[in-house]
């Protein structure tokens, strides 16, 4: 694009035009017209006969207050005026500027940039790296130069793809890499504030560092709250080997609150102890003043000053004068409005100024070279430039990018000024020591990383040679595989030997067991006339059902008996009579695998697997024999009396056994009352676990179960294909719920529904409605019924685990252990004549004590909180938007205590607080606590009451003040008891604090303000804040208040406060406040007259006592 041809070229055009006039008019008139035109042209100002070049300064000036502090309008005007006055620039064109606002959201920022197409001839910007590449491509398309100091995108260095883009400052990444290389800090973390511009900056910084081969561990964004900052810093702390943390946000030194709070949070987490170095990214974009420049934020914030000891500030060196000095000089010359103070301006002002000069110098070079100022030509002629910027000498390299010298600034714990330590030479890309060492926390910098991270053309693996690392890993892998293979071979060999030999053999034959006729001999008790007729539905997974008959003395064989003696103990054999089991060698190999999986299952409530029996074509599982039979047998035997303690003991045994199985990652899959056996000590044990694994071991397919057998199966398993019903953890919980129903009603599953099993199964498969047993409430405690319903929930994920079931079940018995023997003894004692009376009497006493305990608890805590604590629930902190707080104390309490005996002080407080407690009972208020003579009451919590809280507290305060007016101390009746009262309304957070003697406490600024209202009040006065007065006036209930005036509240400044002096319809007398002295003050203790009267009376009493 051609913007001008020079003054001489324009004059040539004028001459050509007037030569044509000579051909059409007379000589005299032509000469006259020629002179007139020549004089007119020469008298025109420069701006008329030169072409303008308008520079658009793009940035988030309207939506970011800290960017707007750079005063882009003032900086651009100052630069443009100086350029247009500078005779060294080509005068064939003039410069203008326009301030273009960039939206703080990236998508909108790009859209607004496109709309700026016709508004400028070239652009300084963008400021947001999120759309720098898109803006550069648009600039190329528009043939308009893009000159940016903020685009960190390393892709823009490609001049072929982006010929119209140029940096007015060195790439911040080059500066960072130079510093990181010098200190050997390779591992970096990047954290940004949550504004779009900084989030994109952080991502581009991380990408650029990674393009240099440096490991960036984390790239995080933090919010403004401390919780978000703490979480982000903890993630950095957990990341591996991070040395340097780059903070992409506004610097705390120029008003960036996010960075200030972030550093304070890092200080609290002890991350500023020298483990990490923090680098503010934005300081790389401008020249931060440091010579004789104290920073108030460091002086006023000791925590930040300590944290800043771990910060290295890298900024553009101000070689000639500081930014503030240059700004002050320009203001003194009238170039900048006088009302602007230099410390209110961001140093980014100088960067904007320098960028405009950058474009002007490039334009000047292009026009002198070839008279053309296209965008690509401007970028090309910005190479190897040198000009004076706002407060330093500016140069460019052979690529047209700015070259500036940088300085590393540091501080220490004693100062709030920054001082120079190193300079960063960007031409040589090295650091030069400036004479003052860096003060690192702990006396030394963070640990250095391996040098290979900064070696070009070399892949770094944390300092370990890749070939060596691969060789070590391969050697270790081969060794580990060899050891595991050898160990596995030895173990398999030992297991095979143990299968049939030695004391731990698991594959038994007829030589190892002796089948017996199932009658009890002397070992099991005198039951010679009883024998067992035992049937076993093995393939269906059904455990033995025991029936009794007399006189059965048939000889026992493996064919007609399931009971045998093995090593002196009775065992039960669960037979598998179907299928082709193969030869003994095949059985050995498969039995070893399954037994290895099941042999370690040892628990009091698990029936242990003793081995496998294989002989004469029969295979069986060998387990301990339980003489009481299955749980189903006990439930159907009406001769066995079961109270709830007995039932809960059996259920608890079942829970313990299943909990153990699930902890070992074992799914039962066939849990039912028939698979729960009870031994002679009435201990329930779970059996038939691992049934599916045994079927697989024997290569048997599962036979279809009868409908009655499926009543314990979970609905989701019923809907599954028959071959895939291998069970699940949630399915076992459902089966347990059905067993609970059996135990509660002493009946079969779904016995109360009076439907055939086929119909029940169909309804279970196809809800809605959800079909479950109905258990009357009188059969079990409500808590137990509720647990049962949770366990058979339709959604499997909603069912509790056995750990949760165990924890709930323990609470049903108040933590007492269930014991079958104790239960039987208690059943026998119930026949005693006085047992019922004794139980009733004890129950009544327990209920009375319970009521006393609950009453005491509700006096200490709010009823709702107390109820939650009784249920074992956690009381979460609760926020209240608006409550009213009451604080009062006794005026002169210290003096009264000094003149009284300790017991008299206790009596005084007890009498006074008893009076107060009686008064607050008639108001909707909650007594929070008493500490010494301080009395604290709240309304609006824990039960919310709308806007009534202010009225309730005000009414209570008037009642208390009235009652105190007539209150007399027993030991000092002549000394009046004066109180001062403070009221304030606002938000609070309430919660229970502590485990031992828990307290219901209030937190928030409202509590502090209410306390300040009391402490700045006067005797016999109710001191009320503006917030409370506003609520009382809105209620329109006739409260009478008078303005006290502006009152100094500690930590709050001066606020307008009021006195509450009464209420329409309140007829009780109020005490007269003491008079105010001539200085407007009143005594905050006892008056000398009152003290003297008391001492005189005390002396008289002492004299009376001493008389004989």
From Swiss-Prot:
There are 9 conserved cysteine residues in sensory guanylate cyclases, 6 in the extracellular domain, which may be involved in intra- or interchain disulfide bonds. Pfam families: ANF_receptor (PF01094), Guanylate_cyc (PF00211), HNOBA (PF07701), PK_Tyr_Ser-Thr (PF07714). Keywords: Cell projection, cGMP biosynthesis, Disulfide bond, GTP-binding, Lyase, Membrane, Nucleotide-binding, Sensory transduction, Signal, Transmembrane, Transmembrane helix, Vision. Residues 532-812 form the Protein kinase domain. Residues 51-467 are extracellular. Activated by GUCA1B when free calcium ions concentration is low, and inhibited by GUCA1B when free calcium ions concentration is high. Inhibited by RD3. Its EC number is 4.6.1.2. The chain crosses the membrane at residues 468-490. Retina. Localized exclusively in the outer nuclear layer and inner segments of the rod and cone photoreceptor cells. Its main location: membrane. InterPro entries: A/G_cyclase, A/G_cyclase_CS, ANF_lig-bd_rcpt, Cyclic_nucleotide_synthase, HNOB_dom_associated, Kinase-like_dom_sf, Nucleotide_cyclase, Peripla_BP_I. Residues 1-50 form the signal peptide. Residues 884-1014 form the Guanylate cyclase domain. One of its GO terms (cellular component) is photoreceptor disc membrane. GO terms for molecular function: ATP binding; GTP binding; guanylate cyclase activity; identical protein binding; peptide receptor activity; protein kinase activity; protein-containing complex binding; signaling receptor activity. Disulfide bonds join 104-132. One of its GO terms (biological process) is cGMP-mediated signaling. It catalyses: GTP = 3',5'-cyclic GMP + diphosphate. Responsible for the synthesis of cyclic GMP (cGMP) in rods and cones of photoreceptors. Plays an essential role in phototransduction, by mediating cGMP replenishment. May also participate in the trafficking of membrane-asociated proteins to the photoreceptor outer segment membrane. PANTHER family: GUANYLYL CYCLASE, RETINAL GUANYLYL CYCLASE 2. Belongs to the adenylyl cyclase class-4/guanylyl cyclase family. Homodimer. Interacts with RD3; promotes the exit of GUCY2F from the endoplasmic reticulum and its trafficking to the photoreceptor outer segments. This is Retinal guanylyl cyclase 2. It comes from Homo sapiens.
């Amino acid at each position: 694009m051609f913007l001008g041809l020079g003054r001489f070229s324009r004059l040539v055009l004028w001459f050509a035009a007037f030569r044509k006039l000579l051909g059409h008019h007379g000589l005299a008139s032509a000469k006259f017209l020629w002179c007139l035109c020549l004089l007119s042209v020469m008298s025109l100002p420069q701006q008329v006969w030169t072409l303008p070049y308008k520079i658009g300064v793009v940035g988030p000036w309207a939506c970011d207050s800290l960017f707007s502090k750079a005063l882009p309008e003032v900086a651009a005007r100052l630069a443009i005026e100086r350029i247009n006055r500078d005779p060294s620039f080509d005068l064939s064109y003039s410069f203008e500027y326009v301030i273009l606002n960039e939206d703080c959201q990236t998508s909108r920022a790009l859209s607004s940039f496109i709309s700026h197409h016709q508004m400028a001839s070239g652009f300084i910007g963008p400021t947001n790296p999120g759309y720098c590449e898109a803006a550069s491509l648009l600039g190329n398309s528009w043939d308009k130069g893009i000159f940016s100091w903020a685009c960190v995108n390393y892709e823009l260095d490609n001049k072929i793809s982006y010929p119209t883009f140029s940096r007015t400052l060195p790439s911040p990444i080059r500066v960072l890499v130079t510093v990181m290389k010098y200190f050997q800090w390779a591992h970096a973390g990047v954290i940004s504030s949550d504004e779009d511009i900084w989030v994109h900056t952080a991502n581009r910084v991380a990408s650029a560092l990674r393009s240099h081969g440096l490991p960036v561990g984390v790239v995080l964004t933090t919010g403004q709250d401390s919780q978000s900052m703490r979480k982000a810093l903890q993630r950095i702390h957990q990341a591996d080997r991070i040395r340097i943390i780059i903070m992409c946000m506004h610097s705390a030194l120029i008003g960036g609150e996010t960075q200030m709070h972030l550093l304070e949070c890092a200080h609290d987490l002890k991350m500023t102890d020298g483990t990490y170095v923090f680098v503010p990214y934005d300081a790389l974009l401008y020249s931060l003043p440091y010579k004789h420049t104290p920073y108030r934020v460091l002086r006023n914030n000791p925590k930040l000053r300590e944290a800043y000891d771990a910060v290295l500030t890298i900024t553009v060196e101000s070689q000639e004068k500081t930014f503030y000095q240059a700004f002050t000089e320009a203001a003194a010359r009238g170039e900048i409005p006088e009302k602007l103070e230099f410390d209110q301006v961001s140093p980014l002002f100088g960067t904007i100024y320098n960028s405009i000069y950058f474009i002007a110098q490039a334009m000047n070079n292009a026009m002198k070279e070839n008279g053309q100022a296209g965008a690509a030509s401007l970028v090309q002629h910005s190479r190897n430039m040198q000009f004076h910027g706002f407060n330093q000498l500016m140069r460019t390299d052979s690529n047209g990018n700015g070259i500036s010298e940088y300085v590393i600034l540091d501080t220490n714990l004693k100062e709030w000024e920054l001082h120079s330590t190193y300079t960063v030479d960007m031409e040589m890309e090295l650091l030069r020591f400036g004479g003052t060492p860096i003060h690192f926390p702990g006396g030394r910098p963070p640990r250095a990383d391996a040098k290979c991270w900064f070696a070009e053309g070399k892949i770094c693996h944390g300092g370990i040679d890749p070939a060596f690392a691969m060789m070590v890993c391969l050697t270790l892998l081969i060794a580990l595989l060899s050891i595991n293979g050898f160990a596995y071979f030895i173990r398999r060999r030992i297991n095979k030997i143990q299968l049939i030999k030695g004391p731990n053999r698991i594959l038994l034959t007829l030589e190892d067991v002796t089948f017996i006729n199932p009658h009890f001999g002397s070992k099991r008790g005198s039951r010679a006339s009883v024998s067992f007729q035992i049937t076993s539905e093995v393939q269906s997974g059904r455990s033995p059902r025991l029936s009794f008959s007399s006189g059965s003395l048939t000889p026992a064989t493996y064919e007609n008996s399931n009971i045998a003696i093995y090593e002196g103990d009775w065992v039960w054999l669960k037979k598998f009579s179907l299928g082709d089991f193969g030869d003994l060698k095949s059985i050995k190999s498969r039995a070893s695998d399954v037994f290895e999986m099941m042999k370690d299952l040892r628990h009091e409530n698990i029936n242990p697997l003793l081995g496998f029996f294989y002989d004469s074509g029969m295979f069986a599982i060998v387990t301990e024999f339980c003489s009481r039979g299955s749980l189903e047998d006990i439930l159907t035997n009406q001769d066995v009396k079961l109270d709830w303690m007995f039932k809960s003991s059996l259920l608890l045994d079942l829970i313990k056994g299943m909990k153990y199985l699930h902890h070992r990652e074992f799914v039962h899959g066939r849990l039912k009352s028939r698979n729960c056996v009870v031994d002679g000590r009435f201990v329930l044990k779970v059996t038939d676990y691992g049934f599916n694994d045994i079927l697989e071991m024997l290569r048997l397919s599962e036979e279809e179960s009868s409908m009655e057998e499926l009543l314990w199966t979970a609905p989701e398993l019923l809907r599954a294909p028959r071959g895939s019903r291998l069970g699940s953890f949630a399915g076992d919980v459902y089966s347990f719920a059905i067993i609970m129903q059996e135990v509660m009603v002493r009946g079969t599953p779904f016995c109360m529904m009076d439907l055939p099993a086929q119909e029940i199964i169909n309804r279970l498969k196809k809800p809605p409605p959800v079909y479950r047993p109905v258990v009357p409430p009188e059969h079990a405690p409500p808590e137990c019924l509720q647990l049962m319903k949770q366990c058979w929930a339709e959604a499997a994920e909603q069912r509790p685990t056995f750990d949760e079931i165990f924890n709930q079940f323990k609470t049903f018995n108040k933590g007492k252990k269930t014991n079958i023997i104790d239960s039987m003894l208690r059943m026998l004692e119930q026949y005693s004549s006085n047992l019922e009376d004794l139980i009733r009497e004890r129950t009544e006493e327990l209920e009375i004590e319970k009521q006393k305990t609950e009453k005491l608890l509700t006096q200490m805590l709010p009823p709702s909180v107390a109820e939650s604590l009784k249920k074992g629930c956690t009381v979460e902190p609760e926020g209240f938007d608006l409550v009213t707080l009451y604080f009062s104390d006794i005026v002169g309490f210290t003096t009264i205590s000094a003149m009284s005996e300790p017991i008299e002080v206790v009596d005084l407080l007890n009498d006074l607080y008893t009076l107060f407690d009686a008064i607050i009972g008639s108001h909707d208020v909650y007594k929070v606590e008493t500490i010494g003579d301080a009395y604290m009451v709240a309304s609006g919590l824990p039960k919310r009451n709308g806007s009534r809280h202010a009225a309730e507290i005000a009414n209570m305060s008037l009642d208390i003040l009235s009652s105190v007016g007539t209150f007399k101390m027993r030991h000092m009746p002549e000394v009046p008891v004066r109180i001062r009262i403070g009221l304030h309304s606002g938000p609070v957070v309430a919660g229970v604090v502590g485990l031992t003697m828990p307290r219901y406490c209030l937190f928030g600024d409202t509590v502090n303000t209410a306390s300040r209202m009391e402490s700045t009040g006067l005797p016999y006065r109710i001191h009320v804040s503006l917030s409370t007065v506003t609520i009382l006036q809105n209620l329109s209930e006739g409260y009478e208040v008078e303005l006290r005036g502006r009152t100094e509240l500690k930590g709050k400044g001066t606020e307008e406060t009021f006195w509450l002096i009464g209420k329409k319809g309140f007829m009780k007398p109020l005490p007269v406040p003491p008079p105010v002295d001539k200085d407007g003050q009143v005594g905050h203790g006892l008056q000398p007259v009152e003290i003297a009267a008391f001492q005189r009376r005390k002396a008289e009493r002492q004299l009376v006592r001493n008389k004989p």
